Every structure is written in structure tokens, then in C-alpha cells.
């Protein structure tokens, strides 16, 4: 038996779709399905495949989103972020953008020996953003 770890990156949007992000949501939902299918195909070979679903992480992608929002609203970026959290992500309980390091910590665990009984799972790194018990 071999040994390996694969972690696919999806998004909160895979579990909690938004009408203004339909193509992105559909693509990220497909990532979850792919991870689950691959996990079933390769677990017997010792290759454990899982996924993570981050939400609103401070990154170049969300920086650009918030810059565009700030320009549209004619406000500073910090105000655009606050507006986004209040109006678009009211269930994000921590009321802040996540950090890349927080997602990396979960991925590091999933790539370690400590995750030897974790396969086909999706870990939400979402600050409480997904307003359901969906898995």
C-alpha cells in the first residue's frame, strides 16, 4: 500500500451558493464532488484525498473584489469590506476576512500522518459563514 495526500481547494460558495456568482459556485461544487469521487478511487492505495472550503480569505482575489466594491461605492477599501460583511456575509460570525495561514494550517493537517483516518472530507475554513449544517 502506498502513501499520499491530496487536498483540493473549493469554497464556501460550493455549499452556500450566491446568485451573482453562479458559475463560480457551480465550479466549486464540482471540486467537492471530484474530491469525494477521487477519495473513493484512491483510498485503498493509501492516497487520502480531501478538500477545504475557505470563505472570504485575504488574498489577491478578494483584494480585487473589495477594491472594485470600494470604487463602486466611492468609499475606502476598509469600508467596502465592512459593507460586504454586513450585507453579503451576515453569517460570517467572526466578521473578518480569514488569513491564508488559517487555511494553510488545515491543509497542513490534512497532508500529515495525523490525518490518517480522514478521507473524502471537506473542511470548512469559513469563520461560520455557511449558515447550515451542510457537509
Predicted ranges, named:
Residues 27, 35:
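Active-site helix of classical SDR
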Residues 43, 48, 118-120:
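Short, small/polar-rich loop/turn modules that mediate ligand/substrate recognition or access, typified
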